[in-house]
Regions:
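Conserved donor-binding/catalytic core segment of Leloir-type glycosyltransferases
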Residues: 194, 221, 229-247, 253-257
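N-terminal strand-loop element at the rim of the active site
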Residues: 7-13, 26-79, 88
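Donor nucleotide-sugar binding/catalytic pocket of nucleotide-sugar-dependent glycosyltransferases
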Residues: 132, 145-226
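A charged, aromatic-enriched C-terminal amphipathic alpha-helix characteristic of glycosyltransferases
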Residues: 76, 367, 371-404
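Acidic donor-binding loop of glycosyltransferase active sites
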Residues: 237, 298-312, 325
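Conserved acidic donor-binding segment of nucleotide-sugar-dependent glycosyltransferases
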Residues: 341-342, 346-353, 361-367
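Nucleotide-activated donor-binding/catalytic signature segment of Leloir-type glycosyltransferases, i.e.
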Residues: 273-295
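Short hydrophobic beta-strand element within catalytic cores of glycosyltransferases
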Residues: 317, 326-329
Length: 423
């Protein structure tokens, strides 16, 4: 099978790129012929593989482009990338080739989606965010710090400044979304999507194409199995991620300070000083490598995951479970699906400081932390999340379903044409 993987970056700059690269390499290891289509270098070392051809348009992503006008146009419609994709797909056998779309909004643009659709090769798209529907890809009102329930591109949406920057940026995103829908034909002509959580499918169900098939694929977490940690032996709670408002870091800082709980923030971001003001005793590590972040996890009482928006999963929660650390997660986040409330961790009401404080207070009980952590560990290592081979087998099964559905559609179309010709 030939697999065309489409992603803005060819290196790991976030969870989506990590998944795209892991899957591409895993499929290549299984003997599939993989083309990795991207816009931005550098190329990850893992992609240097005998069964992988990297096709790069050699461009900037939108934020790093020194030419703002060029970035403005490229973000709406990347003509160069569309041409490269169109040329690549011209001579491929559509009966044994599949296009797997990941992220295209930061460099490649919806032009590559339209070029893919024009090839008539079967397509599947992983929903790493909500960009198929929402102009900001988040369903989140940043100034109000709350989940947005407005219909995307409705008059109410257009008049609402929900952007993380300013209203002018929101209007640019609206333009991009309109072009994606009307010229890029996304999502209306995409018939297969992959989700990593039920919540992602539920949020998107009203915006996908009629008849679109939603395939659930448990994400794989790269983690080496070691004995479970001992959360009962430590008092410090830990947060891993970017220090930005929508991730709920100030909520976490205020709650921990009120309960006199030590809290370590592993990450960097613009809210570092506000966090220090909210919790003067909090430790902020700045950026650290993966091995160091794992050490912070293993010496924590619990992971706090206070995100204010939906999220499409919450990979760090799975990583905490892999080491036997319980997690505190909001009830509006997809992370609630991987934390069994009162069994492998605790849920709290999203944005509710009093409820978060109460749940943190519960986890001051070392015995409870130990029981929840061990249950999280056992649950993780008995699930598909811990097996790359299971993940790849499930992905191949999805590909086979997509190809079979396309063949059935072709057969129906041919039959209809034959009936018409007889008439």
């Amino acid at each position: 099978m030939k697999v065309i993987v489409v992603n803005d970056n060819a290196h790991v700059n976030g969870g989506a790129a990590k998944v795209a690269i892991q899957e591409a390499v895993g499929l290549a290891d299984r003997g599939h012929s993989v083309y990795f289509v991207c816009a931005v270098r550098p190329i990850a070392q893992a992609l240097i593989h005998s069964n992988i051809n990297v096709v790069c348009s050699e461009q900037y992503d939108l934020l790093s482009n020194p030419n703002q006008f060029d970035a403005f146009i490229q973000g709406w419609w990347n003509t160069k990338a569309a041409h490269i994709v169109g040329q690549l797909l011209t001579d491929l056998d559509r009966t044994n080739t599949i296009i797997h779309l990941h992220v295209w909004t930061r460099a490649l643009s919806a032009s590559v989606v339209r070029a893919s659709l024009a090839s008539d090769i079967p397509i599947v798209c992983t929903l790493h965010d909500f960009s198929l529907a929402c102009p900001t890809a988040t369903f989140f009102n940043h100034p109000r710090q709350q989940i947005c329930h407005l219909d995307p591109l409705s008059p109410a949406c257009l008049l609402t400044n929900c952007d993380t920057r300013n209203y002018a940026q929101k209007l640019w995103r609206v333009g991009r979304q309109f072009i994606q829908q009307q010229i890029g034909h996304a999502p209306r002509d995409i018939q297969h999507v992959i989700v990593h959580s039920k919540l992602a499918g539920e949020v998107m169900q009203h915006y996908l194409a009629p008849g679109c098939m939603v395939h659930n694929l448990p994400v794989y977490i790269e983690s080496t199995r070691s004995p479970p940690a001992h959360p009962e032996a430590h008092e410090t709670f830990v947060y891993l991620g970017r220090l930005v408002r929508e991730k709920g870091v100030l909520l976490a800082a205020r709650s921990a300070a009120a309960e006199n709980i030590p809290l370590t923030f592993v990450g960097s971001g613009p809210l570092a000083e506000e966090i220090r003001a909210a919790h003067p005793q909090a430790c902020i590590t700045g950026w650290v490598d993966h091995a160091t972040s794992v050490n912070y996890l293993r010496t924590a009482r619990a992971l706090i995951f206070p995100s204010m928006w939906y999220e499409t999963l919450g990979l760090v929660v799975l990583e905490a479970a892999a080491h036997g650390i319980p997690s505190l997660v909001p009830d509006t986040s997809a992370a609630r699906e991987i934390v069994l409330d009162g069994v492998t961790g605790l849920h709290f009401r999203s944005g509710d400081e009093a409820d978060l404080r109460a749940k943190m207070q519960q986890l001051k009980d070392g015995n409870l932390a130990r029981v929840l952590g061990r249950a999280a560990y056992d649950h993780f290592w008995s699930s598909n999340y811990s097996s790359l081979e299971d993940h790849l087998s499930s992905l191949e099964n999805i590909y086979r379903k997509v190809l079979a559905a396309e063949r059935t559609e072709d057969t129906i179309l041919v039959s209809q044409l034959e009936v018409q010709s007889v008439r």
